[in-house]
């Protein structure tokens, strides 16, 4: 366990550690570790259909589909096929494994003869031990004249009379990048069919801050950490990247001669575009589902929460406190609520309010709580919480998941360095976050129950991830 000095780091809200905490009468209540699954399943059964648990819980309490993903076969003699097949097979397997909803059958259990066409499927060999699978993904890939063609099927091998669940054909350039995209598309089709109609995330992007170029710039990568590339080249300090719901614009905070301002990058134009300057310190933009932007601004003195339209016009002040109030995040399902961090009672705590600034509610009741992010179904917040913050306390920044209505919470990370800036995937099954567990700040992902933790970045310091909406 890491021990933190009582003095907050520079990323924390100024002067908040010198004030005293206040207790809540409606305190956030822990769900004890041994009762996590039972308590949350009961809660979800009482408040939402089972589909919501699939979206949020990554299979807790739900039987996983047993799935075999056979290596696709070559359908042409082109020598380029070998490398392209490996790229496809590796990518498809990783996508299905990352989904968190399958019991993937080990390839060591597969029959010697794996199918490349429907006529080659040996049903008894697949639906009995050792594979004993319910579903089988298989197909073939061929490359010729610089083009690649792929045929893929998903079969219910327990239903020999009518086995086909999915059949797809794809064609693209015969390059590794194009084949990766095809694998992502096929994986997402399988996930959609077998995952309760929830769209897969294999084609989504993650935006983050990286120092590897010598400056804090905004970068992007595929959901699995592949294809990392720099977006901004401002040669300054850029923070808090937030992608718009349609994926066309990226809002972030950056410091220039005028101070901290909200900046905007257009992916349609592949360049920075103008955005109004508001004066004061302007930080942590957040998009609403309908394209408004909430952010923290000190234009009126103390940092408070403001909201503007997509072009930066029609600014409205939502909070009016000596806070400071920072880090807003919209309810991504309804757009009618905003969660944010405030130091109005001492140490920073998480609050919610209506999108017009009314109905203020305190969510956390102790410690040091920051970086809230709302789940796609609007039911949960995930955030970083040092529950025992203070001199002499063995505090640790861990990630928590809280049901907003009941204030019941579950701890997702356990004393694995500093963990911060969690962000939900669009399917609600995954969370990406920043962690210092490897000895430097890097981007990690996990299932929304805290399992299947994977490191996505390695080079340089990488922080503040934001997952695309789709």
List each language-model region with its residue ranges.
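Short beta-strand->alpha-helix linker/helix-N-cap micro-motif
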Residues: 58-124, 140-141
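Residue-level detector of Asp-centered blade-edge/turn motifs that repeat once per structural unit
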Residues: 201-202, 245-246, 288-290, 332-334, ...
């Amino acid at each position: 366990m890491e021990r933190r000095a009582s003095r907050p780091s520079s990323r924390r809200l100024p002067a908040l550690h010198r004030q005293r905490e206040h207790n809540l009468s409606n305190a956030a209540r822990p769900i004890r570790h041994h009762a996590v699954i039972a308590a949350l399943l009961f809660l979800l059964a009482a408040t939402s259909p089972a589909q919501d648990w699939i979206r949020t819980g990554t299979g807790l309490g739900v039987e996983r589909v047993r799935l075999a993903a056979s290596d696709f076969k070559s359908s042409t003699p082109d020598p380029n096929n070998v490398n392209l097949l490996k790229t496809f097979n590796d990518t498809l397997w990783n996508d299905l494994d990352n989904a968190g909803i399958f019991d993937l059958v080990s390839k060591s259990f597969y029959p010697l003869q794996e199918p490349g066409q429907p006529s080659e499927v040996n049903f008894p060999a697949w639906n009995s031990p050792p594979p004993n699978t319910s579903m089988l993904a298989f197909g073939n890939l061929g490359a010729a004249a610089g083009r690649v063609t792929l045929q893929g099927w998903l079969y219910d091998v327990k239903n020999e009379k009518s086995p086909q669940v999915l059949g797809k054909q794809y064609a693209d350039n015969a390059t590794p990048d194009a084949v990766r995209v095809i694998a992502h598309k096929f994986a997402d089709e399988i996930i959609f069919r077998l995952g309760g109609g929830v769209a897969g995330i294999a084609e989504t992007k993650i935006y983050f801050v990286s120092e590897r170029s010598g400056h804090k710039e905004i970068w992007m990568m595929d959901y699995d950490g592949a294809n990392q590339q720099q977006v901004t080249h401002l040669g300054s300090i850029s923070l808090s990247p937030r992608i718009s719901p349609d994926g066309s614009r990226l809002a972030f905070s950056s410091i220039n001669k005028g101070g901290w301002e909200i900046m905007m990058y257009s992916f349609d134009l592949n360049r920075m575009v103008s955005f109004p300057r508001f004066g004061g310190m302007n930080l942590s933009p957040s998009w609403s589902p309908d394209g408004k932007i909430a952010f923290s601004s000190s234009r009126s003195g103390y940092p408070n929460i403001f909201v503007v339209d997509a072009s930066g016009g029609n600014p409205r002040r939502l909070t009016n406190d000596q806070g400071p109030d920072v880090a807003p995040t919209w309810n991504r399902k309804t757009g009618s609520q905003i969660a944010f961090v405030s130091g109005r009672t001492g140490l920073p705590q998480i609050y919610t309010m209506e999108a017009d600034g009314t109905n203020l509610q305190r969510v956390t009741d102790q410690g040091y709580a920051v970086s809230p992010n709302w789940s796609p179904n609007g039911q949960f917040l995930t955030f970083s919480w040092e529950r025992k913050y203070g001199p002499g306390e063995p505090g640790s920044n861990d990630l928590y998941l809280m049901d907003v209505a009941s204030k019941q919470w579950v701890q997702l990370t356990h004393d694995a360095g500093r963990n911060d800036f969690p962000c939900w995937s669009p399917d609600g099954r995954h969370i990406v976050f920043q962690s210092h567990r490897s000895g430097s700040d890097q981007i990690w992902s996990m299932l929304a129950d805290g399992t299947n933790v994977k490191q996505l970045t390695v080079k340089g310091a990488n922080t503040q991830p934001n997952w695309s909406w789709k």
